[in-house]
Amino acid sequence: MNLLEQKEYRPNVAVIIVNLSGKVLWCQRKQHDGWQFPQGGIDKGETPVEAALRETKEEVGLDEHDIEIVYESQQWFRYKVPKEKRTGYFTKKIFFGQKQKWFLARLLSDENKIDLNAYRPIEFDKWVWANYWHPINAVVSFKKETYRQALLSILPEYNKLTKKL
């Protein structure tokens, strides 16, 4: 990947939150059929960890007291957003895709703390606890390969975490 392509991927984070049963938090996008993990862009001057904590708080209402980040991917996982799906940054042709750092987090608090209405704009309508591999088949098609690669990469850390639960 050349330097120009790297700059055309929006820096982003994705957070896999695991409950005491080893299930992962899976969220439905507001007014869309699409489901995904909490995710979002990295703001200027922000570290990926800071972005992961901020996005988790904004999207699902959980703060640093509610989750413990146990793993950060070393690599960036990339995906292109299809032209017909591009909005916001993507319609302005600043970015044609996203590069993501992936995080694995353990839920410390009760699931009652999950609040999809915590911040505006609201990102998700609904959430469920899902099996670890469920997202690969349920995410929008253009993210499937990225999810597969990220989940395979994180699997050893997920297995370590769930053995402790």
Segments predicted by a language model, with ranges:
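Charged phosphate-binding loop/patch that engages nucleotide di/tri-phosphates or the phosphate backbone
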Residues: 132-165
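Acidic, metal-coordinating catalytic segment for phosphate/diphosphate chemistry
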Residues: 1-14, 18-20, 92-93
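Entry beta-strands of beta-propeller and related beta-repeat scaffolds
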Residues: 23-24
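Unchanged
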Residues: 42-141
